[in-house]
Amino acid sequence: MTNISISEEIATACPDLHVLALSCDVCNSEPDERLWQEIADEEKAVRETVKLEQINKWLPIQATRQAYKRLGKDPNRYRPSSEALRRRILRELPLYKVDTLVDLINLVSIRSGYSIGGFDADKISGGSLVLGVDRKSVV
């Protein structure tokens, strides 16, 4: 089992942060049409119930944006993934088809409003993962 921890910077800036970690064995595949039908249904529901100017007012997204600000990140430049996905939907831009696991994580993110990370435990070196803030400048 991988040991997951939160950096001191995040723990200090976001004392109410809750993290859920699930571990499971899965078999990934190319994009699945049944899953993409479910994603299409969710896209339709988002278009029917959400306005572009309301996205960042939704509590899960609003909380993530506040956390970004506390950590020195501009949430208008570095949008939470759940917000970015909903914005793509409302702009009628297609969502990227990556693979079944990534597409499923994106669907859960769209529905829940929470940004979700998926990691391959076999690729985590040293058996531990620290959730932190990237301080590298992006060009």
Language-model features: where?
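N- or domain-start disorder-to-order transition segments that initiate the globular core
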Residues: 2-3, 40
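Conserved phosphate/anionic-ligand binding catalytic regions in large, soluble enzymes, centered on
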Residues: 94-119
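Conserved small/polar residues in nucleotide/adenosyl-binding loops
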Residues: 138
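Glycine/proline-rich, flexible active-site/cofactor-binding loop segments
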Residues: 32-84, 90
